[in-house]
Amino acid sequence: MKSLKEIILESKNVHHYVDAIIINPDNELLLLQRAGYIKQFGGKWGFVGGSIDNKDKSPKDALIREIKEETGIELTFNENHAIKQLYKKNHLDNDGEVVSDTEYFIVELESKPEVKLSREHSRYKWFDRNSIKEKQNKCVPDVFNIIQRYYENN
């Protein structure tokens, strides 16, 4: 059963998104650089993620689908991949109304997979805790803050 808050958010045409903080066994974090032709934040580094579609049964289903579409990495619930929610953020318009929300999930991999980028992205890189700082000003807004939140909790 949906909560009142969920019903209210859905009735306002709120867009729902998921993002994955993908971590390999070396404790490196995967970021993708958006292709230059992308209107919103083209050329910026960000997480794997996207919209939750009507066909997705849950945010985790959307996350698994987006990871496969954007990186070629296939995850299933049968495998030993840890997927846990880190944070959920509401995005507001100028009137303070919620227009979208993003759920951020940590995805811990058992191996360092081959990444096959979609055409939405031009590059990818696995970053350790120190090297990620060099991209701080080249990231999509909030990405670096979410990364800091991850490291504070892990």
Residue ranges of model-derived segments:
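Unchanged
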Residues: 52-82, 86-142
